[in-house]
C-alpha cells in the first residue's frame, strides 16, 4: 500500500511515548552550526546524528562516501549514511526537566483543561504560572482535591495538617490531577448530575463538561496528554538556516524559539541538581512554561516574544495560520512548473480553439518534448546534445517544434480566476513577437481586455490531462456560461458594430425598390455598387418575394438556412439570442465555427463602415431649453406650496427631485429622437457595441441629479452636459459621486473575493453523487415578484431545465409526467396554458446523505444536457454567485455617481382577474372621489389581498369585475395623510409638537416627537363638536407632521397630519453586496420588523407596559389564544386595530430576519426567503444567476439541526449536529423501538457553517486553524476525505469529475466480436 493510498485520516493527541517514538534523538544543546567550519554542532538543533547527513550518502567526518555504504552508521562520527532528504522528515525531541501545559488546551474558550478538572480558566492559569497551589491528594475532608490555595493558605494548612494533603504549583500539579481522572466514572457522575439539574445555567455548564469527557473516552485520548513532558523538535530542513552574501546567517524563527526552550530547560536541570531555593526553581519553571508557550503559539498569552527588530517571532501555530500559512500558501495553492506568462494582444485571425504562443515561449515550455523528438528523429545523438540544440535555438529545432505542439493543448488562465471559464484550453499556434495572442470571443469569459492585461500559460503533461483539456476545456466547449445558461462567447464592440451597421435599413438609398430574382444577383449588384448597403429591395427566395436589404442578405449568407431572418437588425442582444438558438439546434462545434464567421463578418464590415466619433456627433437637443424652463416653473410652484403650508419640507424635497428626474428623462428622450439613426454614437449605444444611453445622456443631454456625500440626492440638478461643459459648482457637485465610485470599487473587490472564498468553502463537497434519490419532495415555484409588483424573474426562467416533482396537471388533464425535465417545448406549453405554479425537484429537498442527485439538480446549464455524475456542482454554484459579486462591485464606475431615480409608484394595480371585495375600508367623499380614511384596509380579488392606506382614492367599486393590471387605487407617493372625517375643532392630547423653522424659506413645521408628558400614552387628536363632545379620535404616530394647530377648526376631508413614506435612496450595489453577505451570513438585519407568529386579528391596546405599546394578535379560531408584542414607542406600526393578519406578516416597519421566518413559517419558507432575497439583489443589478446555484448554498446553510430532546441517543440537548447524522441515529433507534431524537432546524451563516464542516482539514484551512485542530484532536476526529479541499491538501485526486469514486471501479471489457487482433 503506497503512501497515497488511504481512504481517511485521523488526528489525535500525541502521548509522550508517541513523541519519543517519532524522535531520532534528544537535542540537548542550543547551538546550531559551528561558525568556522559551518558544520552542524553535535547534539544541537541541526545535529547530523539526530536529523541525518547534510550531504547525500556521506557521513559527517567524510570517512564513508558513496551509495554503497547505504544504511551504515559511521563509528567515528555516529552519522548514518543515507539521503540528505531525511533531514526533512526525521524529528528530534527535548526532554523537559519539569512538565509544561500545551497552550492550545490551557487557554482559549471553551477551555478544555479547566473543564475536565472542573475549575475556572482563571484559576487554572494561576496554577500553571505559579501564582497558586492546587490540592492533588488529601486525607482531610476540609481540604478537598482540586481546591486552589494561595501561598498564605498553603503554609497555614501545612502547619495544621502536615503531610495529610499534597498541593503543587505549575503543570506538575495539573498533571497529577489529570492522571488521576477516571473518565468513565466522571462521565457517569456528570450524567446523573445533569438528570437532576434544574437551572438552565447549570445544565449548560454540565453539558459542556460532559461533551469533553465523552470526546476523550470515544477517541481514546488521555487528559494528561494535554501536558507535555517531551517537546518534539521538527526536522532540521523545515526550519532552515541559510548563509547570506555578507557571511551572515538567516534563520527560521523557530530556531530562536527552540533555543530559548533548550536554554531554560538546561538551566532548570542545573538548578534542580544543585538543589537551588524553591523560589528560584519556581521562577525557572514558569519561564520554561512561557518558552514552550511561545514556541507553540507566540502571542497567545502575555507579551509575544520578539526578535531584535521588534518583530514578533513566528511560532508553530503561525506556520499553519492565515493566507501565508502552510494550508493556504503551500497546500491549496502551489506554484507550478511548465508555465509561462506574458502580455496578451488580440488575435482576430485565430480559430476559436487556437491561441498564439510566442516562439521563444514555446521553445522553453515544450523543451523536454522537443528534446525527445530531436533524439527520436536522430537529429541529435543524445539528450545532452538535444538540450544544447534547443538552448541555441538551432534551425533543426524549428523543424521539430511544429509537430511537437501539434496535438498538445495549453491552458490559458487570467487572474483573478473567478469562475471555471477563467481557465480554458487552446491549441497553440507559433507566432513571432513576445505577446500571447488571444481569440477576441473568449475575452468576455476571461474578463480580459488588451490594455496591458497579462495571462499565464500552462502546459498539459500527462495524456489524461491532455484528454481532459481537449474534451472539457477547449474554448469551443465553453460558449455557454454555467451560471445562467446564457451564451458567454458573444461578439462585442467592433464585431457587433459591423453586423449592426450591415443589417440596418435606410430609406432613400441608391437602388431602393429594385427586384432581384436570387441572392447571387443581389451580391453581384452590391459588389458593382449598383445598390446601397441599406437600400430596401425585394428578392425572390423559395418562391416568395422578401423585402430586405443587401447588407442583411450578406449577413444571412453566413448563417445556416433554417436560422436566417431577412427582416432583423442584429445588435448585441439579437446576436446573443441567435447564438443560443444555434447552440440548441446544432451543438458546440458548429456554433463555434458560426460565431467565428460572425466575428470575421463583423470585423470586416465594421472596418468598411468607418464608424468614428467626433464631438459634432453629440447633438444637444433643441427642445432642452424649453424642457428646463418648464421644470423651473414646476419647482417654483412646489416652493410656493411649501411656503403656504400645503406641503411639508420632505415632500417639497422629494417632489423637486421627481421633477428633475422626469425632466432628465424627457431631455434624454428628446436627445435620442433628435439623433440620426446612423449617428455613430447613437449606433454604438443602441447596438450594444459600446456605451449606453445613460452615458449618452451625460454627454449630450443633461447630467441630472447627483448624490451627495451621505448618498442623499442633491435637489439642484446638473443642467449641463459634458459637451456644453460644467460650471465650477456643477463640477464640484459631481466630483464626489465620481470619486465614490472609484473608492467603492477598490473596497468591494476584496469583499467580493472573500464572499467567493466562503461560498466555495461551504459548498465544495457538494457533488452529483447518484442518478436519483427517489424523493417525492420538491419546491413550489412561481414567478418572483418584487416589492413594487414588478416581475423580477419569470416562471419560465425559474423552472427551465428543472425536473418535475409531481405530474403536471392542468384542469384535470395530465400535461407531463413526474421526473420529466422541463425543456423549451414544455415551457411554451406551460406559458400557453397560463400555469402559475409548478412543483419542481430541488437540491433543497434532495434526500441524498451527501451531495445531490441528477434529478434534483436538473440540467447542466453549460451544455443543456442532464448533469453528469461526479460534477462538482457546489464549486460551480459558489463561483456563479461570487463571480458577478465582483462585477456588481464595479457598477458605479462608468456612469460616474449619477443618482439613480427611484421610480415613483402612485397606484396599486390588480395582480389577477376577478371580482373586487373590500375589507375594513372606510371612505368619505371629497370632490366627488372616494377617499379612504381607515388604516390597514384591504381590497381582495380572488385570493390576492391589496393593502390600502388612508388617503388613497378608490378607483373601483365593490363587486366590480377587473382584469389583471387594472388600477385599483391611486395615492400620494410621498406621504400617508390622516384625514378628518368630520367638521369640528382639533384638540391635541398627550403631545406638544416640536416647532421646526426652515431658515431658507421662513416656514414653520410641527413634528410630533416623544416628550416627557407623552411617556405613558400615545399622541392623539380628538375632533370635537360645538358642545366639546368627541366626534372622532386619531392616533398620531411619532414622526408625523401636524398640518393643523391645536384648537383650529377643520372641515370633513381636511388633512390633520402627514406620515412620511420611507423613500428609496440611490440604489447602488453598496446595497447589493453587503445585502448578499448579510443573507448568506444569516445575520439579523438592522431595524428588523416584528412579525406575527399566529393568524389572527390585531388588537392595539391603550395601556402600556414598560413604556412600550402593547399589540395583541388574537386567534380567530380560538379567541382565548393570543400573542402579545411589546413595541417600542418609536417604531412604526404597519397594522391597525381590528386588522386580520397572517402568521409571518409584519406588525412593524423594517427588514425581515430569516430566523423569524424559520421559527414562524418553517424550514421551506426560510429557505425560499433567503433564495428569493438573494435573487432580488442580483436581478436588480441586471445579473442572471440561476436559482439552483443559490439553492445549493442555502442547502448547506441548513444542514445542521439542534437537538431538543435526545431520546434514547447519546446526543446532548442543545447540541448542533448534522441532520444526516441525527437521521441515521433515529433510524437505528426506530429499529430498536427506542425513544427517538427530537430536533429543530437551525440556520448557520456561511462562515460558521464552513468552520463547522465535517472535515477538519477543510475547516482548518478556512479559518480559526488552531481552534479547529485542537478540537479535532481531542475528539480523535476522522476525516473521510469527501470534499475537494481535503483531497487537494493531501495531494490526492479530487473525488469529482474524472476522479469521481464510481468511475474508479470501472472495468474495461472488450465485446467478443471486436476484440483487437493478436499481433
Swiss-Prot record:
It catalyses: RNA(n) + a ribonucleoside 5'-triphosphate = RNA(n+1) + diphosphate. It comes from the Bacteria. One of its GO terms (molecular function) is zinc ion binding. Keywords: DNA-directed RNA polymerase, Magnesium, Metal-binding, Nucleotidyltransferase, Transcription, Transferase, Zinc. GO terms for cellular component: DNA-directed RNA polymerase complex. The keyword Transcription applies. Its cofactor is Mg(2+); Zn(2+). Binds 1 Mg(2+) ion per subunit. The RNAP catalytic core consists of 2 alpha, 1 beta, 1 beta' and 1 omega subunit. When a sigma factor is associated with the core the holoenzyme is formed, which can initiate transcription. Belongs to the RNA polymerase beta' chain family. DNA-dependent RNA polymerase catalyzes the transcription of DNA into RNA using the four ribonucleoside triphosphates as substrates. HAMAP family: RNApol_bact_RpoC. This is DNA-directed RNA polymerase subunit beta'. It comes from Fusobacterium nucleatum subsp. nucleatum (strain ATCC 25586 / DSM 15643 / BCRC 10681 / CIP 101130 / JCM 8532 / KCTC 2640 / LMG 13131 / VPI 4355).
